[in-house]
Design a protein with these regions (language model features):
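Generic detector of well-ordered secondary structure
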Residues: 4, 150-151
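Accessory beta-strand-rich segments of carbohydrate-active enzymes
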Residues: 1-135
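Long, well-ordered, tryptophan-enriched scaffold segments
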Residues: 137-140, 153-154
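Edge strands and adjacent loops of beta-rich recognition modules
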Residues: 152-174
């Protein structure tokens, strides 16, 4: 089971496959009060040996343009952007239970690697800009060489996370 959230929006990948079944995860929230997370059962996607978990993270509601934001002068510079913050962030916990009864939790931390990919801009209102020349083939597969990527910078802890987000059909995102 993997639990994931973002200050912004994310698209979760495991072993080269997209895990996230919805767009704009984890969903809108007033980031000053709460942050939702989603839980995904990835049991069938885990493989023996090495696995690779990663995410594409974008501004979303956290630091992107908000509806009517520019017209109403929202945000620190009255541009309609950065209403809640400037830098998107991602958090994940992968819970693994082995057949012998032992378990392991893999957390996002400074051992994770980050880079800029082909999505050079991704905003809910301004749209996405995609530069295919910057594609990173195989970036979420085991053995990918990310040695030229930067180390992730851990975000400061918040007061806590809310219960899992449910989509509009009332089902838990799994």
């Amino acid at each position: 089971l993997v639990h994931a959230t973002a200050l912004g929006i994310y698209d979760l990948h495991l072993n080269g496959e997209r895990v996230t079944g919805n767009y704009f995860a984890p969903g809108w929230t007033d980031y000053r009060r709460s942050v939702y997370y989603n839980s995904y059962d990835v049991t069938s996607r885990l493989q023996e040996g090495s696995n690779c978990l990663g995410a594409v993270v974008a501004d979303g509601w956290y630091s992107g343009y908000l509806p009517s934001g520019k017209a109403k002068g929202y945000g620190p510079y009255r541009t309609g952007r950065n209403m809640y913050g400037k830098n998107p962030a991602f958090l994940a916990q992968l819970h693994i239970e082995y057949e012998d009864g032992t378990s392991q939790i893999v957390l996002t931390d400074s051992s994770w690697k980050v880079t800029t990919g082909p999505e050079t801009a991704a905003d809910l209102l301004a749209g996405e800009q995609y530069d295919a020349r910057k594609e990173l083939a195989g970036w979420s597969t085991p053995g990918y060489d990310a040695s030229k990527w930067n180390d992730a910078i851990p975000a400061t802890k918040s007061k806590g996370l809310n219960p899992p987000f449910s989509d509009k059909t009332g089902t838990r995102a799994t």
